Protein backbone atom coordinates (compact mmCIF):
# COMPACT_ATOMS: atom_id res chain seq x y z
CA UNK A 1 0.00 0.00 0.00
CA UNK A 2 1.47 3.25 -1.12
CA UNK A 3 0.55 6.75 -0.14
CA UNK A 4 -0.09 9.58 -2.52
CA UNK A 5 1.21 13.03 -1.63
CA UNK A 6 0.12 16.04 -3.60
CA UNK A 7 2.12 19.20 -3.09
CA UNK A 8 0.51 22.50 -3.83
CA UNK A 9 3.04 25.30 -4.14
CA UNK A 10 0.69 28.24 -3.60
CA UNK A 11 -1.68 26.72 -1.07
CA UNK A 12 -1.62 29.75 1.27
CA UNK A 13 -2.72 32.02 -1.59
CA UNK A 14 -5.46 29.63 -2.71
CA UNK A 15 -6.93 28.97 0.73
CA UNK A 16 -6.96 32.55 2.06
CA UNK A 17 -10.56 33.62 2.61
CA UNK A 18 -9.71 37.33 2.29
CA UNK A 19 -8.88 36.94 -1.41
CA UNK A 20 -12.50 36.60 -2.51
CA UNK A 21 -13.45 38.46 -5.63
CA UNK A 22 -16.28 40.83 -4.83
CA UNK A 23 -18.56 41.61 -7.72
CA UNK A 24 -21.32 44.19 -7.80
CA UNK A 25 -24.89 43.05 -7.26
CA UNK A 26 -26.36 41.86 -10.56
CA UNK A 27 -29.56 43.57 -11.60
CA UNK A 28 -32.74 41.79 -12.54
CA UNK A 29 -32.20 39.97 -15.84
CA UNK A 30 -34.96 41.29 -18.00
CA UNK A 31 -35.83 42.29 -21.52
CA UNK A 32 -38.22 44.80 -23.03
CA UNK A 33 -40.70 43.49 -25.57
CA UNK A 34 -43.68 44.69 -27.55
CA UNK A 35 -46.94 42.77 -27.82
CA UNK A 36 -49.59 44.35 -30.00
CA UNK A 37 -49.34 48.11 -29.44
CA UNK A 38 -47.95 47.91 -25.90
CA UNK A 39 -44.41 47.70 -24.52
CA UNK A 40 -43.64 45.55 -21.48
CA UNK A 41 -40.75 44.47 -19.30
CA UNK A 42 -40.27 40.72 -18.99
CA UNK A 43 -38.34 38.88 -16.30
CA UNK A 44 -35.88 36.28 -17.61
CA UNK A 45 -36.35 33.33 -15.24
CA UNK A 46 -34.20 30.36 -16.22
CA UNK A 47 -35.74 28.43 -13.34
CA UNK A 48 -39.20 28.66 -14.91
CA UNK A 49 -40.26 25.86 -17.21
CA UNK A 50 -43.06 28.02 -18.67
CA UNK A 51 -43.71 31.63 -19.65
CA UNK A 52 -46.57 33.35 -17.83
CA UNK A 53 -48.71 36.49 -17.80
CA UNK A 54 -51.47 37.63 -15.43
CA UNK A 55 -55.09 37.62 -16.61
CA UNK A 56 -55.23 41.44 -16.58
CA UNK A 57 -52.38 41.57 -19.12
CA UNK A 58 -54.11 38.92 -21.25
CA UNK A 59 -57.19 41.17 -21.42
CA UNK A 60 -55.01 44.13 -22.45
CA UNK A 61 -53.30 42.11 -25.17
CA UNK A 62 -56.60 40.74 -26.47
CA UNK A 63 -57.74 44.27 -27.33
CA UNK A 64 -54.69 44.78 -29.58
CA UNK A 65 -54.29 41.54 -31.47
CA UNK A 66 -56.49 39.15 -33.41
CA UNK A 67 -58.98 37.39 -31.17
CA UNK A 68 -57.59 34.29 -29.56
CA UNK A 69 -59.08 32.32 -26.75
CA UNK A 70 -57.42 30.87 -23.72
CA UNK A 71 -57.28 27.09 -24.04
CA UNK A 72 -57.98 24.96 -20.99
CA UNK A 73 -54.92 23.22 -19.60
CA UNK A 74 -54.62 20.69 -16.80
CA UNK A 75 -51.43 21.90 -15.13
CA UNK A 76 -50.38 22.80 -11.62
CA UNK A 77 -47.46 25.17 -11.14
CA UNK A 78 -45.17 24.94 -8.13
CA UNK A 79 -43.80 28.35 -7.21
CA UNK A 80 -40.41 29.15 -5.69
CA UNK A 81 -42.02 29.58 -2.26
CA UNK A 82 -43.47 26.04 -2.62
CA UNK A 83 -47.05 27.27 -3.14
CA UNK A 84 -49.00 25.69 -5.99
CA UNK A 85 -51.35 27.45 -8.38
CA UNK A 86 -53.47 26.36 -11.31
CA UNK A 87 -53.41 28.65 -14.35
CA UNK A 88 -56.63 29.86 -15.97
CA UNK A 89 -55.40 28.43 -19.27
CA UNK A 90 -52.81 28.79 -22.01
CA UNK A 91 -52.60 31.61 -24.57
CA UNK A 92 -50.83 30.16 -27.63
CA UNK A 93 -48.68 31.66 -30.39
CA UNK A 94 -48.59 35.24 -29.15
CA UNK A 95 -46.30 37.35 -31.35
CA UNK A 96 -43.66 38.95 -29.13
CA UNK A 97 -41.42 41.60 -30.70
CA UNK A 98 -38.01 41.15 -29.12
CA UNK A 99 -35.33 43.29 -30.70
CA UNK A 100 -36.33 43.46 -34.36
CA UNK A 101 -37.81 39.98 -34.63
CA UNK A 102 -41.26 38.65 -33.75
CA UNK A 103 -41.24 35.32 -31.93
CA UNK A 104 -44.27 33.09 -31.31
CA UNK A 105 -44.67 32.47 -27.59
CA UNK A 106 -47.06 30.42 -25.47
CA UNK A 107 -48.08 31.96 -22.13
CA UNK A 108 -49.81 30.40 -19.18
CA UNK A 109 -52.45 32.87 -17.98
CA UNK A 110 -52.47 33.23 -14.21
CA UNK A 111 -55.15 34.61 -11.92
CA UNK A 112 -52.51 36.36 -9.81
CA UNK A 113 -52.20 40.13 -9.37
CA UNK A 114 -50.17 41.97 -12.00
CA UNK A 115 -46.76 43.47 -11.25
CA UNK A 116 -47.02 46.78 -13.09
CA UNK A 117 -43.26 47.06 -13.63
CA UNK A 118 -42.56 43.57 -14.91
CA UNK A 119 -45.79 41.68 -15.68
CA UNK A 120 -44.30 38.96 -17.91
CA UNK A 121 -42.20 35.97 -16.86
CA UNK A 122 -40.21 34.42 -19.67
CA UNK A 123 -39.20 30.80 -19.05
CA UNK A 124 -36.85 28.33 -20.71
CA UNK A 125 -39.06 27.56 -23.75
CA UNK A 126 -38.91 31.25 -24.72
CA UNK A 127 -35.12 31.35 -24.26
CA UNK A 128 -34.82 28.33 -26.52
CA UNK A 129 -36.96 30.03 -29.19
CA UNK A 130 -34.99 33.30 -29.11
CA UNK A 131 -31.62 31.55 -28.69
CA UNK A 132 -30.98 33.64 -25.56
CA UNK A 133 -27.63 33.98 -23.86
CA UNK A 134 -27.61 35.55 -20.40
CA UNK A 135 -24.27 36.99 -19.27
CA UNK A 136 -24.40 37.98 -15.59
CA UNK A 137 -20.91 39.48 -15.60
CA UNK A 138 -21.69 41.88 -18.48
CA UNK A 139 -25.34 42.10 -17.32
CA UNK A 140 -26.68 41.42 -20.80
CA UNK A 141 -29.21 39.18 -22.50
CA UNK A 142 -28.49 38.42 -26.16
CA UNK A 143 -31.27 37.14 -28.42
CA UNK A 144 -30.77 36.02 -32.00
CA UNK A 145 -32.40 34.44 -35.00
CA UNK A 146 -30.33 33.67 -38.07
CA UNK A 147 -28.16 36.70 -38.83
CA UNK A 148 -30.24 39.05 -36.66
CA UNK A 149 -29.27 39.60 -33.02
CA UNK A 150 -30.03 42.08 -30.27
CA UNK A 151 -28.42 42.72 -26.89
CA UNK A 152 -30.38 43.93 -23.86
CA UNK A 153 -28.41 45.50 -21.02
CA UNK A 154 -30.27 44.77 -17.80
CA UNK A 155 -27.99 46.96 -15.66
CA UNK A 156 -29.91 49.86 -17.26
CA UNK A 157 -33.31 48.20 -16.82
CA UNK A 158 -35.47 51.14 -15.74
CA UNK A 159 -38.74 51.26 -13.91
CA UNK A 160 -40.31 53.27 -16.72
CA UNK A 161 -40.88 52.02 -20.22
CA UNK A 162 -42.37 54.14 -22.91
CA UNK A 163 -42.82 53.60 -26.63
CA UNK A 164 -39.98 56.06 -27.34
CA UNK A 165 -37.56 54.14 -25.09
CA UNK A 166 -38.55 50.84 -26.71
CA UNK A 167 -37.89 52.20 -30.20
CA UNK A 168 -34.52 53.58 -29.06
CA UNK A 169 -33.55 50.13 -27.73
CA UNK A 170 -34.29 48.57 -31.10
Residue ranges and their predicted role:
Residues 1-170:
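Proline- and glycine-rich low-complexity segments
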Amino acid sequence: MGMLFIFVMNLPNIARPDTKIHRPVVGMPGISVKIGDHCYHGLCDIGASVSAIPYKLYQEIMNDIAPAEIEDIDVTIKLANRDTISPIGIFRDVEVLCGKIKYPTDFLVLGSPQDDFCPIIFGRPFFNTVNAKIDCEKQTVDVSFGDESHEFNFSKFSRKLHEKEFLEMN
